[in-house]
């Protein structure tokens, strides 16, 4: 398992360097599963944009928005790995079998059914998964009420 944060994949040159490291690990005979964050300050930029277009961004839509940055990263990293002669497959959390509760912005992992990841690695692929953690909330937004999936009022106005 290798984990790369936003700084590690902040630009094309860094993505290529990460791909080189991953490919070297795979070519040494090791199976590789990679977890990667959004590029650079993408998550911060997306949160800022959400608060510019909405006084009360819903938790569900924030989750949807913030996963977009990591989807970009996993796709670009897979492209760079494939360009280096290895097979790579990107996975979202749901594709990887991560099951959570319904609390947007603070979801708890209930179960992991990693069959698709295991199958991909067993077939010789490098599995690349996004890092987005639904529990990572905007620091200024209050958590949703435990019995409600509706978004609370955001204090950033």
Language-model features, listed with the residues they occupy:
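Nucleotide/pyrophosphate-binding catalytic subdomain
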Residues: 1-157
């Amino acid at each position: 398992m290798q984990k790369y944060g936003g700084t590690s994949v902040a630009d094309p040159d860094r993505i290529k360097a990460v791909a080189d490291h991953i490919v070297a690990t795979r070519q040494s005979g090791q199976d590789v599963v990679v977890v990667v964050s959004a590029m650079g300050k993408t998550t911060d930029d997306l949160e800022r944009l959400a608060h510019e277009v909405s006084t009360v961004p819903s938790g569900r839509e924030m989750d949807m928005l913030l996963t977009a940055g990591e989807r970009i990263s996993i796709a670009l990293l897979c492209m760079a790995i494939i360009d280096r002669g290895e097979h790579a497959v990107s996975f979202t959390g749901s594709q990887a079998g991560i099951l959570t509760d319904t609390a947007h912005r603070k979801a708890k992992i209930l179960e992991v059914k990693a069959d698709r990841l295991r199958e991909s690695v067993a077939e010789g692929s490098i599995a690349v998964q996004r890092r987005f953690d639904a529990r990572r909330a905007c620091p200024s937004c209050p958590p949703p009420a435990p019995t409600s999936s509706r978004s609370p009022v955001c204090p950033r106005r």
